[in-house]
Amino acid sequence: MALSLFTVGQLIFLFWTLRITEANPDPAAKAAPAAVADPAAAAAAAVADTASDAAAAAAATAAAAAKAAADTAAAAAKAAADTAAAAAEAAAATARG
């Protein structure tokens, strides 16, 4: 019997989710046995992970701010060019008569 596209889609999603879960296991699940074995090392790893997350967030914020600044500069340049073109057109119309 033929499987419906919906069922095929569900199976693909299931296997895709399982593959991602196996490739990137839950950090909390990995940290629990490590915390029992060596609490100091587990705490240091948690601090390092938090620091890397903070650094990634800061980098993303800086990138967003740079993009916003570039977009603002581009919009200002376009507005200035449009204003200059309108002024030149008005001057030409005045000179014609």
UniProtKB/Swiss-Prot annotation:
- Signal peptide per UniProt: 1-23
Keywords attached to this Swiss-Prot or TrEMBL record, sorted alphabetically, are: Antifreeze protein, Repeat, Secreted, Signal
Tell me where it resides. Answer: Secreted
Major subcellular location class: secreted
Which GO CC terms are listed, alphabetically? Answer: extracellular region
Please list the tissues where expression of this protein has been recorded: Detected in blood serum (at protein level).
Coiled coil regions in record: none
Q: Which residues form the propeptide?
A: 24-48
Q: Source organism's superkingdom?
A: Eukaryota
Show the GO MF annotations.
antifreeze activity
| Family according to the record | Belongs to the type-I AFP family.
- Biological function: Contributes to protect fish blood from freezing at subzero sea water temperatures. Lowers the blood freezing point. Binds to nascent ice crystals and prevents further growth.
Q: Which protein, by its recorded name, is this?
A: Ice-structuring protein
Q: Which organism is it from?
A: Myzopsetta ferruginea
